Structure formats: C-alpha cells, structure tokens
C-alpha cells in the first residue's frame, strides 16, 4: 500500500512535468519565495524517483507482450480488498481509484511475465477447481445464549421477518442495523463453524442455531455466486496455481531479463543506475 501511495505522487508529478517545458514556472507562490516545477520535480526525484521510474519502465516494456483486462483488474482488486480491508479503502481515498488500478495492472503484468515459464498439470488444475467455493451472501442474527436463539428461530419458523428480528435481537453491531446482512464472503472469511453451516444452506434457507466463540448465530443465505464450469475457469485457475508457485526472486529475474532485452536507455544521468540497482535487490 505504501508503494502505491508513493507511486501516485510521482506519476502525477511526471505528468505535470510533461505538460510544459518551462521548468521555472511557479507551482507554489509565497511571500518568502516561490516553488518552481523544476524544484518540485528534482526533490521528488531525489526521494522516490528511482523506484517509480523502474515501475514506469516495467509497464512500458511488459505491456507490449502481455495484456491485462479490466475483468482481471477487478478480480485482483477484490482479492486485495479482502486481504487489506480498510487499508485498501484508505489508499483509494488518498490516491484515487485510477492510480490503484494502474498499480494493480502493473503487478499483474509482472506476474504474467513471471508465470509464463511455470508448468502445471491437469491434475493440479482440477484439484484447485474441486476445492474452489464461490462466494455467498448471508445474513445472521447473533445472540448470547441458546435459549434466545431458539426463541428467535421459532419466530422465523412461524414466518416472521428475518431482517426485522435481526434489528431487534442481534448483538452484532456491524450488521444488526442492516437487518443482519453480512454482504458477500468466501472461504476463510468467517469462523469455521459459521462458514460450514452457511455453505450447506440453499438460497433463502435458514439454519438452526450455530454456536461459535461469539455466541449463537441464526444464518440465512440470501444469494450465491454460480460456480462456473472447469473449462470456463481453466485459464483463471492456471494463473492462480502458477502464481502460488512463484517466488519474488523468480519474478524479478524474469522482468529484469525482459527489460534488458528491450534495450532501455535512461537519459537522466541521476537515474541511470535504476536498472542495475533493481537487479541487486
């Protein structure tokens, strides 16, 4: 996340610098003196310029051979959201969604380049598919004791509204006001007992009370993603299986080779060791 924030500032700076050849143009004016475009550029270049320049070089070189679709970016962003939570939201607030999408695209370009030489078997792909569970959407009513849970379940069995009862009874401050809605989630996002019970339910079905360390849950599944066929998911699965085998050193080595083969020539003398330094990291 810190890398994305840093890149956002410098990429914006470079775009600003490209708009005009007049580096003496003031971008900040004060009573004690102005700050010119050149001063700003040079200061940012000194602080983080080499790291961001390498990102720009990688993107330019890799995008000639590898393509990343909007759908792939969307899917990766969902994965990042699940991993980083509020940190991702903060990154979007500070940098904007466009910058985040560009950095995700670059990461995917590097990964695609690196996994190109990794082999996977049909057996590995089918095992991944068999273990894959699509996301589900569920609501729940959380209470502290089994007696209350059974009372609530009895009311539901008589046809009372789940959302209304969640607002009345649920002890979960994060979902009670929304009628118990937990949104979409996949495997590993809920405690084991909750997840196992939820995945057994059909859409619209309500569970018996489920005990966890948090109390007793009554779960209702409200929607389920349809699991695509193996052939429909095969390319996506192959990418994930290969990525799971990938290590950072292999990725860097492959990207370095592609950059070297592209004949990159850096004109700014202060940045000429960017590629050499990256290879040593």
Swiss-Prot record:
Pfam families: Rotamase_3, Trigger_C. It is a lipid-anchor. Residues 133-223 form the PpiC domain. This is Foldase protein PrsA. It comes from the Bacteria. The gene is prsA. Plays a major role in protein secretion by helping the post-translocational extracellular folding of several secreted proteins. It is found in: Cell membrane. Its main location: membrane. GO terms for biological process: protein folding; protein transport. Belongs to the PrsA family. A lipid is attached at residue 19 (N-palmitoyl cysteine).
